[in-house]
Curated annotation (Swiss-Prot):
Example GO BP: reciprocal meiotic recombination
Family: Belongs to the AAA ATPase family. PCH2 subfamily.
SUPFAM superfamilies from the UniProt entry: P-loop containing nucleoside triphosphate hydrolases (SSF52540)
Source lineage: Eukaryota, Metazoa, Ecdysozoa, Nematoda, Chromadorea
The UniProt record lists the keyword Hydrolase: no
Source organism, top-level taxon: Eukaryota
UniProt xrefs under PROSITE patterns: AAA
Name of the gene this protein is made from: pch-2
Gene Ontology cellular component list: chromosome; kinetochore; nucleus
Record has ATP-binding as a keyword: yes
Protein name: Putative pachytene checkpoint protein 2
Keywords on record: ATP-binding, Meiosis, Nucleotide-binding
Record Gene3D superfamilies: P-loop containing nucleotide triphosphate hydrolases (3.40.50.300)
Length: 424
């Protein structure tokens, strides 16, 4: 049975252009470009890159302009085909043209009042950047997590643009992702910031991410940690003074700064740790007046976080361990990447027999899809991070420069078992 045709209201196109071309060159050809998107849409997947060969079909004048194209909407599942979309019309305001920054991060120093010492408190990234490229589309979750987070943050941004009265409608612009280590929380934050910097580049001429080293904010000097937290947020406030600059703040492992004060008191923790929590909460309240600041926090230990910090979060999402289907997709992506660079190769295997995209249990599967799905089931207990490390282990086990597809499957199964035994 065919799925009913869908009508989508909010489709976005992200176009990365070559450094040597100005944006105006591309903008003049939007209408021509939109027709090509419609023609290629049947094979396009939500938030997945479209092949330039497939898109431009030999038009070298267009092909040389573009490095990457992604189309997507929060109305479809991540990776879902656009083949059942009724009308793939993209509003010109939803076509986002961008270039990547290649300068790398800049270390930001903070120090004690006497100026005798300074420590690296954060890394400053210009967005969108090379280092965060492709993070978003390569994050695989079973739930609609990516769309939910993106939709919520977009709603926060729209409310901020309308200058909502925050005394009536509480908007803190604070996102908290929780879950066990290795599930992609930090990567999701970086991918989200990259994605939003592209989507909002018509409003903000510049976007930056300040990645805070929360461990460095604990001074060796008693009672200084609260002051260091304040100094860090002074830097954030200074960046946000430019209303044309979107500032993303990433606080990884926020439990280092935001541990529950009640439990700290009961365990006779140093009062400096409690001062740091107080300072963090005060600075979050202070920075909320800035419409162009979004704070992204991750935590491996949600139960240890101070309740006042969790309560300030606009949205709290748990990022769990991947399911069988998510692990399968990760393994398949790894194999296809190894095939792309010429490591996995098998001329005797027809294209139709390579592992397939599977969205549900009813999808018909070929032989290698079945084998890989069994490997994914065997890999229960491995995090996304652990799975992403398997290809190197697989390649190290091969005596040859290239690996046949059947042998690749055997090596992946061996690598999964080895990694599981290491975890146990």
């Amino acid at each position: 049975m065919h799925e009913p045709m869908k009508t989508l209201k909010n489709i976005h196109a992200e176009i990365r252009i070559c450094q040597k071309f100005p944006k105006s060159t591309v903008q003049k050809r939007f209408s021509e470009f939109e027709e090509l998107i419609k023609a290629a849409s049947k094979n396009a997947r939500n938030w997945k890159p479209i092949s330039s060969v497939e898109l431009f079909q030999g038009d070298s004048s267009l092909n040389e302009l573009f490095e990457k194209l992604v189309i997507g909407t929060c109305e479809l599942r991540d990776g879902e085909l656009f083949e059942n979309v009724n009308d793939l019309t993209i509003n010109p305001s939803n076509i986002h043209v961008y270039k990547l920054h290649k300068d790398g991060p800049l270390s930001q120093n903070i120090g004690d009042d006497d100026g005798d010492e300074s420590i690296i408190g954060s890394q400053l990234w210009q967005l969108p950047c090379v280092e965060f490229d492709s993070i978003w589309e390569n994050l695989i979750y079973d739930s609609n997590l990516k769309n939910e987070v993106m939709s919520y943050v977009a709603a926060l941004a729209r409310l901020s643009e309308k200058h909502v009265n925050t005394k009536i409608i509480n908007v803190n612009r604070l996102i908290l992702l929780t879950g066990p280590p290795g599930t992609g929380k930090t990567s999701l934050c970086k991918g989200l910031a990259q994605h939003l910097s592209i989507r909002m580049n018509d409003k903000y001429s510049k976007s930056v991410m300040l990645e805070i080293n929360s461990h460095s904010l604990f001074s060796k000097w008693f009672s200084e940690s609260g002051k260091l937290v304040q100094k860090m947020f002074d830097q954030i406030d200074e960046l946000a003074e430019d209303e044309k600059c979107m500032v993303f703040v990433l606080i990884d492992e926020v439990e280092s700064l935001g541990m529950c004060r009640e439990s700290s008191s009961s365990r006779s923790e140093p009062s400096d740790a409690i001062r740091a929590v107080n300072a963090l909460l005060t600075q979050i309240d202070r920075i909320r007046r800035r419409d162009n600041v979004l704070i992204l926090c991750t935590s491996n230990l949600e139960s240890t976080l101070d309740k006042a910090l969790v309560d300030r979060a606009d949205i709290v999402k748990n990022v769990g361990q991947p399911s069988d289907f998510a692990r399968y997709s990760m393994l398949k992506s790894s194999i296809m990447e190894l095939a792309r660079i010429g490591v996995v190769i098998d001329n005797e295997v027809h294209t139709d027999y390579w592992p397939q995209d599977i969205c549900d249990t009813k999808a018909p599967r070929n032989e290698f899809t079945e084998i890989l799905f069994k490997i994914a089931q065997e890999a229960r207990g491995l995090s996304g991070r652990a799975i992403s490390m398997l290809p190197t282990l697989v390649y190290s086990k091969s005596p040859e420069e290239t690996i046949t597809l059947p042998n690749c499957m055997n090596l992946f199964l061996e690598a999964v078992k080895e990694r599981l035994s290491r975890n146990n």
